[in-house]
Each structure stands twice: as C-alpha cells, then as structure tokens.
C-alpha cells in the first residue's frame, strides 16, 4: 500500500498574501497605477480560495502607506532598496505593513507567513533573508 502525502491547501489569508505580493511586485515593476494593477490582477489571476476583501485591503493599504513602510524597512536592510530583489521588496513591504498596521495579527504569524510566501516566490535563500530582516524590524515596531 502506498502512502500519498496530502498536500494542505493554503488558507484564504495565505492566498490573499501571496496575491498581494504578486500585485505589489507588478505595481513596482510596471509603473502602472495601483488601480490598474488591482483590476488587471483580479481579472487575470486565479482568485479561487483567496480572501478577496483581505487581498484588497492589504494591497491598497500597503501602497497607501508605502512611504511609512519603506521608511520602517530601510534601516534594517543591508543594501539600497533598488538593489533588493523586487519579490523580496514586495514581501518585506507586505509584512511590515501588517506588523505596523494590522495589530490584530500576531507578529509571529506575520513573520511566518512572509517566510512561507518567500519560499514560494523568492530565490532559494530569500526566506532566510526575509526572516532576518523581519526579526529586527518587529521589536523596533514594538511587536516582540
């Protein structure tokens, strides 16, 4: 008898975070407005299993607060923003937005979700970099 490993489906919020990272990446590299990116994303991507209201909130609020978010990240990265991988930038922006503004989400959940999203979309070791940066930012934001 063979055992099949059951693949656990990501939660609706995890899927919302994954979609938010993709949309933030698209927004950063395309030069399109947030509204254009959001509309195209919702029309073109598979949104099954996504907490759509949470996706919209995360995407819109991260961009609305981008200066504060980037200011919170800058002291804790080892290079200039334009030298970061755009996916890493999107993951950090989302996580820092959540750490700073979504206080009902425990900081450990935010960091773990960012690591898991980095494993899906980032380079081989990017989840380690994301973890290291967020481990420094969380206490600075009073979240540890």
From Swiss-Prot:
InterPro entries to which the protein is assigned, alphabetical:
NusB-like_sf (IPR035926), NusB_fam (IPR011605), NusB_RsmB_TIM44 (IPR006027)
Task: Tell me the protein's name.
Answer: Transcription antitermination protein NusB
Q: Which family does it belong to?
A: Belongs to the NusB family.
Per the record, what is one GO cellular component?
cytosol
Keywords (alphabetical) are:
RNA-binding, Transcription, Transcription antitermination, Transcription regulation
**Per the UniProt record, which residue ranges are transmembrane?**
none
GO BP terms: namely:
DNA-templated transcription termination; transcription antitermination
**What is the gene called?**
nusB
Tell me the function of this protein. Involved in transcription antitermination. Required for transcription of ribosomal RNA (rRNA) genes. Binds specifically to the boxA antiterminator sequence of the ribosomal RNA (rrn) operons.
State the PANTHER family in the record. Answer: ANTITERMINATION NUSB DOMAIN-CONTAINING PROTEIN (PTHR11078:SF3), N UTILIZATION SUBSTANCE PROTEIN B-RELATED (PTHR11078)
Keyword Metal-binding tagged: no
| HAMAP family, per the entry | NusB (MF_00073)
GO MF terms held by the record: RNA binding
């Amino acid at each position: 008898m063979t055992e099949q490993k059951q693949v656990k489906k990501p939660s609706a919020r995890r899927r919302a975070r994954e979609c938010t990272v993709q949309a933030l990446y698209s927004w950063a590299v395309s030069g399109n407005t947030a509204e254009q990116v959001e509309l195209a994303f919702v029309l073109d991507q598979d949104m099954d299993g996504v907490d759509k209201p949470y996706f919209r909130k995360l995407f819109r609020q991260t961009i609305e607060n981008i200066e504060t978010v980037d200011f919170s990240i800058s002291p804790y990265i080892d290079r200039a923003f334009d030298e970061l991988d755009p996916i890493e930038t999107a993951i950090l922006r989302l996580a820092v937005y959540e750490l700073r503004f979504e206080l009902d989400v425990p900081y450990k959940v935010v960091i773990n979700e960012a690591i898991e999203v980095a494993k899906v979309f980032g380079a081989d070791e990017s989840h380690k970099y994301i973890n290291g940066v967020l481990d420094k930012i969380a206490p600075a934001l009073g979240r540890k």
